[in-house]
């Protein structure tokens, strides 16, 4: 069952035989416990890609012919999962979404450096770092890379269709970091079945950090729930079979 931040803090304080509170800000201990709950939440989010955090996203196009194949990830993206581009030619009404494959920066540069910039279908663009890049201007993109884990650089664009790559032609999904509101009635964005593990982990951390006492029962339950969630996640992804 899902619980609010206040309900989680109240449960933790009750297990620690602390004073009852009606708000997370009532006492220094309740405030400290709420901060530990927050850090536990983000630690739990970071240790796997939670299916419920996978969302469609819209890339941000450069909007400048100086960098026609540059696009930027929006804020809050943890990991890009899928990237397709509509490769329909000008005048075609049927959509042609095709996968665009990732190459690491070294492999991307090696591939692009085989191009001959004396040919009319090759542009020389300058990245924001000042590095020159060779790109094709007569076809939709097939590959992309990133030099800073934020800006995506594609290998080509079709100048007969668009002057730059268009975000309206992108199909993309990514794992997103959920937002946090430090309020009594805030409900952390986790599946209902993950709350037991989440709360037990927070209990163990609060017991140790606030009382310097190891809560063996909470640690054991957190470990048991964590193992169960791990098996469940892999089963969804086609890993462990029962």
Provide a role label for each language-model segment.
Residues 1-242:
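Glycine-enriched, solvent-exposed interface loops adjoining structured elements
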